[in-house]
Amino acid sequence: MGLLGKLFRKKPRDAAAASASTSTVDAADEAGEAAGQRAPDIAPELASALAAFQAGRHESAIAAAAPHAARLADAARLCALAYSAMQRYPEAFPYWLALFDKEPSAHNAVQLATTSVMCGEVARGEAWMQKAAEINHDTHEQSDVAARVNFISALMQSGRLREALPHLAWVRDVYGHVRITDSTFLYMRGIPFFSSFLERSLEILKATQPADAIVPWYGELTGKLDEEGEAQLAAWIGQLPGQPAA
């Protein structure tokens, strides 16, 4: 794997932690690590494309990298990232697909899933998420939860809040499965902090559910968490509207 593979595909643990609060559809954030690199390990014909990308000249980066995209994975990656940084997702998708053909990783499958959503192709995105899960089952290269959070973030950014509900419930049930809500434990597994999950999930629930359905939705976790988590959950539910009369 070349320089761009190292720069823009975070190590599994790093990616999992970062993905708990950010979405990989923001390619500019992924590229941030590149700015300080010296003596880049990249094909010489891509040096100008990388320099342009680092300087934020995305059109120039694409012009320099595109002629090599069929041959070099890093060229396809550069084009995909540059188009994504400009929010030109339909143009980014073919390059993510070309990259996946060369590097069929779970990470790249998630990129195809989130990019599909940003193109308005939710069903295609769901299929790529399934593919990512299948690959990750064998490779264990990333956190399944972090990947799912990225997909939810893409759905939220594209205004597909109702489609995010099943995935949100999946993440909710992870807390009930692991039972532990200690921040370090969650961080090391790419699971969002429990407080962050409560806050971010409410935005989706308010937009898609009747008020009297929100408390029962969170109530699915009652009795399934550690002591700290149960206390946090009770406090959260207690301040929500739609409480039953005492």
Report residues per predicted region.
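Eukaryotic alpha-helical solenoid repeat scaffolds
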Residues: 2-28, 157-246
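Structural signature of alpha-solenoid helical repeat junctions
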Residues: 40, 71, 78, 104, ...
